Amino acid sequence: CKTKVLQRFFIAKNNKRKHRFLHVPHFIRLNTFNTDAEKESVISLQLMAGGPITVADQHNTIGDNLKFYQNEEMLALNTDRFVGKPLLRNVRDEKSQIWYGQMSNGDYVVGFFNRDNEPKKRSLQFSEIGIEGARKVRDLWKHQDEGETDKLEVEVGAHECKIVRLSK
């Protein structure tokens, strides 16, 4: 039986059916991933999709992976009830590997992912996601401010991600 990441259920109200979605996360065992980049990516995608982080590592297998589960800047997405979405839904288009969403305070979070086995360039004009003008950029994994701009061009390594917060 395959585990469904997203289950649909219906709620009848006033004789109308409304679709509701329940995020059912996979339990994450970071010790099963080969690189730190893959560990960051799996946690990032879960949080960008609006899901919680569920730890399945055991005390004897977690090793030094606890740091990935404790990134306060990334966990703030879950605390804020952030839910992002892919720029495009066509999985054959590389823009589908760019995710974005808006936090309750108006900041945007953008995730650049790379599912491929070789480095890829990703670019985004902020106007593509409804942002006019420049924003301050902060890398949420490196905990570094990266200046102010109205576009981003990044090289993302194989199975890596780059998650940034854009603020006024």
Language-model regions, residue ranges each:
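Short, solvent-exposed S/T- and G/P-enriched segments that are highly enriched in secreted/extracellular
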Residues: 148-152
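Active-site-proximal substrate-binding groove within the catalytic cores of carbohydrate-active enzymes
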Residues: 1-143, 153-166
